Design a protein with these regions (language model features):
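Conserved active-site-proximal phosphate/metal-binding subdomains
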Residues: 79-99, 105-201
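Active-site entrance/lid segments in N-terminal catalytic domains of soluble metabolic enzymes
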Residues: 1-97
């Protein structure tokens, strides 16, 4: 679940009603009350921790496991390299399993993080072109044609509208996302929409 989403509470309700076994909280810092509510509902909580201090806070608030994800990841990313996060967090956090994500695509990298103390690794883009993937065929073809330099992170235009950067292949969709941000923020500043409505656009 994206923790900075304005409808997070409703999403938690759905997870609890469906009796899911694990809830992953990413895309912002979860409140302790949200972690507590999920755990009281019977699910385990996996939280993303982009720094050591936040990892400790997530554990104190009840997280059952952590994911540390570096800037090399596909999708939502943090500002620090995966290897730097691993060296900062893995030697210290021993109370809960820690999974490493971001830029991992080969067995040697997996072995390195396991050797450093990771409980496991998370891979996403590595599987996007698999037969089992529901990604559109055109996306799979674009992904196969692309190289690492074809994926760039999005940027935040206005601090009133926090954006967790997303690493994605540059295409018409990423350009449209940036233009939509500009238009929605302009509508907000002109008083045409309130902040919540703007964030949902």
């Amino acid at each position: 679940l994206i923790t900075m989403h304005p409808e997070l509470e409703a999403w938690i309700d759905v997870c609890l009603a469906r009796k899911v076994s694990h809830v992953v909280l990413a895309g912002g810092l979860p409140k302790g009350a949200d972690i507590k509510r999920i755990k009281e509902g019977g699910a385990k909580v996996i939280a993303f921790a982009p720094a050591l201090a936040l990892a400790k806070r997530m554990i104190k608030n009840g997280a059952d496991a952590l994911v540390i994800e570096g800037a090399e990841a596909g999708g939502h990313i943090g500002p620090v390299a995966t290897s730097v996060l691993a060296q900062e967090i893995l030697p210290v956090i021993k109370d809960v399993p820690v999974f490493v994500a971001g830029g991992i695509g080969r067995g040697e990298a997996m072995a390195m993080y396991l050797e450093m103390g990771a409980a496991g690794v998370q891979l996403g883009p590595r599987f996007v072109c698999a037969t089992e993937s529901i990604a559109h065929e055109n996306f799979k073809k674009a992904f196969i044609r692309a190289n690492a330099r074809d994926a760039i992170p999005t940027v935040q235009i206005d601090p009133q509208f926090p954006v967790i950067p997303v690493r994605a292949l540059v295409n018409d969709g990423t350009k449209e996302f940036m233009e939509t941000q500009r238009q929605v923020i302009a509508k907000f500043h002109a008083g045409e929409v309130d902040q919540m409505a703007a964030q949902l656009e």
